[in-house]
Amino acid sequence: MDFIVAIFALFVISSFTITSTNAVEASTLLDIGNLSRSSFPRGFIFGAGSSAYQFEGAVNEGGRGPSIWDTFTHKYPEKIRDGSNADITVDQYHRYKEDVGIMKDQNMDSYRFSISWPRILPKGKLSGGINHEGIKYYNNLINELLANGIQPFVTLFHWDLPQVLEDEYGGFLNSGVINDFRDYTDLCFKEFGDRVRYWSTLNEPWVFSNSGYALGTNAPGRCSASNVAKPGDSGTGPYIVTHNQILAHAEAVHVYKTKYQAYQKGKIGITLVSNWLMPLDDNSIPDIKAAERSLDFQFGLFMEQLTTGDYSKSMRRIVKNRLPKFSKFESSLVNGSFDFIGINYYSSSYISNAPSHGNAKPSYSTNPMTNISFEKHGIPLGPRAASIWIYVYPYMFIQEDFEIFCYILKINITILQFSITENGMNEFNDATLPVEEALLNTYRIDYYYRHLYYIRSAIRAGSNVKGFYAWSFLDCNEWFAGFTVRFGLNFVD
């Protein structure tokens, strides 16, 4: 397998200007000047990301146990667009030194990757035994990164729950997962924390809850529909899973702060995904409230808990007794349980009000009472990438829009530390294209350039953005999309 450097000249060149591109409609083209490393504050981190399931491969090697994604892709290949799995994917387990060499050549400051829970604890629990071969692999990866001047940014859970815990008690549907996650993260802090300065407990917990338990499109594939992998309840399951995820996060943060942070000197946070959700009709009060409601049910679903210790009032009003409750102790544990927030931002959408249907079966997907669209008056909000959910819209980081976003969520943007932990666009994986043509990355360069330009603007306006991680470092397995799309900065044949 050959890795071919496709782009991310942003890491290595001094400056450049884009004044035109085929990626954006002519009417939206802007000459937005030069960007270089010196355009950003000293110490600003540039990196790229990955996850264990999507990159490592070697699913049956080195003592690793199966994850829910292994089961999902093997048992229900029809749920994956091309019927593929990540048994091999880009084989980082065996090729990590080569990968780190590419990172060094591209002048990356940091590499964001996740640890595979079932590679460390194949039985899911400490009592089931520690896989020291898995510990050795991550030690080797971390040491190789540091030897090449690259800072590891470690995610502790990127959706690959040990299958044994799903079988034993239903995984994140059961509060038993909280203590097991705490023990797993404690082990990671102990083994790797002397060299890891940035920890993220969970990656996109909203996607894990929504896609895995409301829509059934992701592992473990539970929802109310009849054509899914496992039966579930789309009206209660996602809320239970969300509740247990946030408590697991808070327990992990508590362990780190009380046992390790004082002498390891690292920081710990969580990585959340959000679109910039705009009212379809700027003059419609119902649409404006719908956009705020939609934000409450996505980014705010977790951010509200992290900053207040409870769910938002709008969620309590709509979901009622289907929404779990925190005890006073749990609320105090959750409130403020982060040093930083990672934001994964890809795109935006228009939101309009959708009155509830009284007789409809409750579902997380319909609870916000909104409709989502990507165009207004027949005009798309931006060019579309390969995935139907990515329309190029970098303007969330314009000062006014970003301040509105933070105001709605009651976030002080000058105090809260956060990084853009994922940002990117994909293209279709067209095997008929010559490599030379596949490497023409005008669209992707333009996408990153514009987002970085507006992120710089947000920083200059007072936002405390500390870093930027492109998604993804390499083309890789993209969950239910399999290998049908490419997000990578680097082309993989």
From Swiss-Prot:
Leaves. Its EC number is 3.2.1.21. The keyword Signal applies. One of its GO terms (biological process) is carbohydrate metabolic process. A beta-D-glucoside binds at Q54, H158, N203, E204, Y346, E422, W471, E478, W479, F487. Keywords: Glycoprotein, Glycosidase, Hydrolase, Signal. The active site is at E204, E422. It is an enzyme of class 3 (hydrolase). InterPro entries: Glyco_hydro_1 (IPR001360), Glyco_hydro_1_N_CS (IPR033132), Glycoside_hydrolase_SF (IPR017853). Glycans are attached at N34, N335, N371, N412. Pfam families: Glyco_hydro_1. It catalyses: Hydrolysis of terminal, non-reducing beta-D-glucosyl residues with release of beta-D-glucose. SUPFAM superfamilies: (Trans)glycosidases (SSF51445). Residues 1-18 form the signal peptide. The keyword DNA-binding does not apply. PANTHER family: GLYCOSYL HYDROLASE, MYROSINASE 3-RELATED. Belongs to the glycosyl hydrolase 1 family. This is Non-cyanogenic beta-glucosidase. It comes from Trifolium repens.
